Curated annotation (Swiss-Prot):
Disulfide bonds: none annotated. Coiled coil: none annotated. It comes from Rhizobium etli (strain ATCC 51251 / DSM 11541 / JCM 21823 / NBRC 15573 / CFN 42). Its EC number is 2.7.7.18. The lineage of its organism: Bacteria, Pseudomonadati, Pseudomonadota, Alphaproteobacteria, Hyphomicrobiales. This is Probable nicotinate-nucleotide adenylyltransferase. The keyword Nucleotidyltransferase applies.
Length: 192
């Protein structure tokens, strides 16, 4: 089984997140995508963070595809930081092939994540295009560090077979929705 792991605050979740999930399922040939709602992000302020239960419920409404499973692994496992969560999820599911899914907009700060290089050396990574990040991903520390491990997006369906580090950038439809803009009132409605 091939499973995409798509983590984030989802504060609030919106159709742009659902689009990233759908692109990942289609282009990577995923059997499932686990939408991992985090209790909090150490790189973001918690002042405007909606309660976890609310973000999970909203994520379930947005993620209409039955192959998408909304989870709260970090809370359930009692861990924080993506690297720790992913290590525990992998240890509990040794026969599953995982791919870490991230929006291209997250690449500019990925090198600030705890153990970011360990994540890249443990999981193949699929970076999904986001507005404003189509070219900026080229200058990210992750893509420069692991440039040798990039596979062509035409081979995205076999990314799960590649030993990490391996990553691809996937172009496709993009949504201009942004959780930050929705919270700031610049864009309407969080849920789809």
């Amino acid at each position: 089984m091939v499973v995409g792991l798509f983590g984030g605050s989802f504060n609030p979740p919106h159709e742009g997140h659902a689009l990233v999930a759908e692109i990942a399922i289609k282009r990577l040939g995923l059997d499932q995508l686990w939408w991992m709602v985090t209790p909090g992000n150490p790189l973001k302020s918690r002042n405007l963070l909606a309660p976890l239960a609310e973000r999970i419920a909203e994520s379930e409404r947005v993620a209409a595809d039955p192959r998408i499973k909304v989870t709260a692994f970090e809370q359930a496992l009692g861990v924080s930081y993506t690297a720790n969560t992913l290590a525990r999820v992998k240890a509990r599911n040794p026969h599953v092939h995982f791919i870490w899914i991230m929006g291209a907009d997250s690449l500019q700060t990925f090198h600030k994540w705890q153990k970011w290089q360990e994540i890249a050396r443990t999981f193949p990574i699929a970076v999904i295009d986001r507005p404003g990040a189509t070219l900026s991903y080229l200058s990210s520390k992750m893509t420069r560090t692991f440039d040798f491990a990039r596979i062509d997006e035409d081979d995205a369906r076999v990314l799960w077979k590649k030993p990490a580090p391996a990553w691809t950038f996937i172009h496709g439809p993009r949504s201009g929705l942004s959780s930050t803009a929705i919270r700031n009132g610049a864009l309407p409605g969080a849920v789809g």
